[in-house]
Amino acid sequence: MDSDDDNMEEVVEGPLDEDDQPHGFCTVTYSSSDRFEGHFVHGEKNGKGKFFFFDGSTLEGFYVDDALQGQGVYTYEDGGALHGFYVDGELNGPAQEFNSDGQLVFRGRYKDNIRYGMCWVYYPDGACVVGEVNEEGEMTGKAVAYVYPDGRTALYGSFVDGELIEARLATLTTQENGRPHFTVDPDSPIYCYDKSTSSCIAGHKLLPDPYESQRVYVGQSLISGAGEGLFAQTEAEANTVMAFYNGVRITHTEVDSRDWSMNGNTISLDEDTVIDVPAPFNMTENYCGSLGHKANHSFSPNCKYDQYVHPRFGQIKCIRTIRAVEKDEELTVAYGYDHEPSGKSGPEAPEWYTKQFLEFQQRESGKGADETC
């Protein structure tokens, strides 16, 4: 995060001293295409200055005797930023990192440019991993915890580079000076990394997720003909993760080539992968590791699908509220099928969806007519 300007040709714009060295506010462009703008004293950076690196990243702070000292901000080429404490040009001390959306993604310390001690790594979905990093700055050890978005429910145990190996259910009880304290349930089952494949939905199919189990349950849907549905076990505010959507991982081509009757529990994860909960795993007696596939469709949903990095299942999707929900309220999402056959704005709609959409339009038209009258 610094420019190695030794033995480099440079072009100086600004005042020079009697030895033709930068002296005062100058702009120095190096042969590497890196550029520095700031204050110099007889050829050495002294005072406020900023590096503009060839890859689009920048480094800004206060220089003393040619080295960055104290608070500095390194901005990545994608707009993310690292705010840290520098000693003689190297990160040594507390630091925070933010992604390009301004969300906190790291909180902890650095030593000689490497993450050090107790560190927190945050995911955009609201969860985090916390623990003492190893000598390489990796979240590896036997006393690391994954903390769910509620900030309390946790899996505490062994991780390698932030990935779950095995852990027990725990509760984050207190924090003191950035150091968490957990109470581990000695009777908890062991949770392990259990990412699905194209043929295996999970190794431990009947092991419920502890966070999800506190928030939802499956019951008879209030929607006519929908079968089972997903319900809130407790009140929840808007933007709350309620359930997870894990399944086997198949391709879009496979989904598109088969009959619609086989696609009742499919959801697109990304441009390459579709998550599917096929029979018999659509029944909770055969699979209950995640329950997100039980959420039914509504044109007036109270939830949405969102990306989620799960400690057991890896990159999946979750069910997240878009408004406050009451205890025992059915959780619904918009499936996002294409309403127009020629539109191709989303997956082609099955017959039941098209029928429900027409009925919804008729109801909305009726409401509009009543309001006009």
Curated annotation (Swiss-Prot):
Keyword Thylakoid assigned: no
UniProt keywords, alphabetically: Activator, Chromatin regulator, Chromosome, Methyltransferase, Nucleus, Repeat, S-adenosyl-L-methionine, Transcription, Transcription regulation, Transferase
Xref: Gene3D superfamilies: Histone H3 K4-specific methyltransferase SET7/9 N-terminal domain, SET domain
A Pfam family annotated for this UniProt entry: SET
Recorded catalytic activity of this chain's protein: L-lysyl(4)-[histone H3] + S-adenosyl-L-methionine = N(6)-methyl-L-lysyl(4)-[histone H3] + S-adenosyl-L-homocysteine + H(+); L-lysyl-[protein] + S-adenosyl-L-methionine = N(6)-methyl-L-lysyl-[protein] + S-adenosyl-L-homocysteine + H(+)
Domain SET, chain residue ranges per copy: 214-336
Subcellular localization(s) per the UniProt record: Nucleus; Chromosome
Residue ranges of MORN repeats: 36-58, 59-81, 106-128
Annotated GO CC locations: chromosome; nucleus
EC number of the protein: 2.1.1.364
Site residues (Histone H3K4 binding), renumbered to this chain: 245, 256, 266, 317, 335
GO BP, sorted A to Z: heart morphogenesis; heterochromatin organization; peptidyl-lysine dimethylation; peptidyl-lysine monomethylation; positive regulation of DNA-templated transcription
Major enzyme class: transferase
PROSITE patterns documented for this protein: SAM_MT43_SET7, SET
Span list, region Disordered: 1-20
Amino-acid positions noted as binding S-adenosyl-L-methionine in the UniProt annotation, renumbered to this chain: 226-228, 296-297
Family under the similarity heading: Belongs to the class V-like SAM-binding methyltransferase superfamily. Histone-lysine methyltransferase family. SET7 subfamily.
General function of this protein: Histone methyltransferase that specifically monomethylates 'Lys-4' of histone H3. H3 'Lys-4' methylation represents a specific tag for epigenetic transcriptional activation. Plays a central role in the transcriptional activation of genes. Also has methyltransferase activity toward non-histone proteins.
PANTHER family given in the database record: HISTONE-LYSINE N-METHYLTRANSFERASE SETD7
Protein name: Histone-lysine N-methyltransferase SETD7
Organism name: Danio rerio (Zebrafish)
